[in-house]
Amino acid sequence: MNSYLLNRALGTVSLSAFHSAQTTRLVHNLEPAPGIRFSSTKSSSSESDEGFAHKAGANVLAIDQYEGRFMVSGGADASVHLWDLESRAAELNYTHEPVSSINKFSHDAAHTHAITSVSIYPFDPTPSTVITTSHDGTLKLSALQPEAITPVHTFNLDCTPYTHSLSSHPSSPLLVAVGTSEKQVRLLDLRSGLSTHGLPGHSSAVLSVSWAPHQPHILASGSTDNRVILFDIRRAGHNSAIATLDMDDAVGLVSPRSAPASYRSRAAFSSHARAHNGAVTGVRWTSDGSYLVTAGQDARIRVWQAATGANTLVHFGPRIQNTSSSHLAERAPLIIPQGYMGAGQETLLWANFNDLDERGEIFVLELREGTFIKRLRVPGLMARRPPTQGRSNALSAARINSLAWRGNGASGEGVEVFSAHGDGTVKTWASRESEEAPTEAEEIEQADRKRKRDVLEEVYRGFMSV
């Protein structure tokens, strides 16, 4: 980093290159910040008090994309909280309290079952509307106010919604895509307050949906039928499904002019194409729309070229876990937005999921090459009692249900990541200088040195007592 500072002073490095180098360093220096807590009750004077954002479990998180100041969390207790992240400034010991909240006891129109997804309306500079789905079979639009969160409209879906997505493209048609326990992707019109139509194509529940950032009419979806389908919402009926991703296709759709005469490109849409050998739990686009990243219950994360649909064959290693569970939910990688990493160094964060062996791990991985960058561990888990063999860890701090990215954390001095956990806590991961946060290897070396000093001191005392 010192060389970049010198070159910046000399004017030999561009501002964008310096910015990428700095933000890359900050991402690589992400570490747990256990002193930053989120508590939905009045903060305790005891620093050892963990503090719980939700009583039954924190399920989902969303941060406003304009200033990154406000975060919304949804819990298994059907509550929704709004948090002001700027109230902390740059302190590393702070307990956040919700600015406003709603639960089934505070409002008659509130959700009655666990929250499954949450997002903040993307077109307001100051967040004013939040969108939530729940196991009660509804999608709700709620107004964010200083003292309360007030539902203003409810879409009754008559099925279980697992996820939803609203495009932030300037030409967005203001349609909310909802993945449900039904086979079709549901489209809800925010302007009319009605359900417009469904997108057929899947043969089972849809767990993840994501609008293309560069095309407001293109939607990607992942399902328990192991398929990823691309839809064009301008088309009707079965014609809306325009392409499927095939994990066995590393070439993709090739133009006849550039392909050999003997080569026959596969059909864009095929009912036999499979993206994973297990349910697809997550679908995400990169910021520029050039790549599509999917996660499946075959313990694989796959990266696809959006232009051709080719599987890039990036392998992230055997450390990835995403096991089958009786509890269906969206589990998608968190892709760091464009501009924070250098060209060709796109990075993603993945929270491992294993019903019977939760370890509280988040992996930082390079998207194009699959290179392992670092592992983040939830602090304090090793000191706790190990889970009972054969029992689910759904209510454990080791269960990471959701990740949220904040690029201007600590009053613009660093980057932050927030994680929602099964025990109801929301934890913070903040970038620190290398001298503030020793690496795992340094910690092991320090522990080894201490052990040797203790042995030598014991031997010395033995000689002195003779």
Task: Tell where the protein language model's regions lie, with residue ranges.
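Intrinsic disorder/low-complexity signal
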Residues: M1-L15, E435-V466
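WD40 beta-propeller repeat fold
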Residues: M1-R191, G198-P200, S208, R274, ...
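Solenoidal tandem-repeat scaffolds enriched in leucines and small polar residues
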Residues: F155, C159-A268
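Flexible loop/N-cap segments at domain edges
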Residues: S287-Y291
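Beta-propeller fold detector
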Residues: L92-S106, P151-F155, H197-L199, S240-A261, ...
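Intrinsically disordered, low-complexity acidic Ser/Thr-rich regulatory segments
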Residues: P256-V280, W285, P386-A398, N408
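Beta-propeller blade-edge and WD-like acidic-aromatic loop motif
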Residues: L190, I233, V303-G317
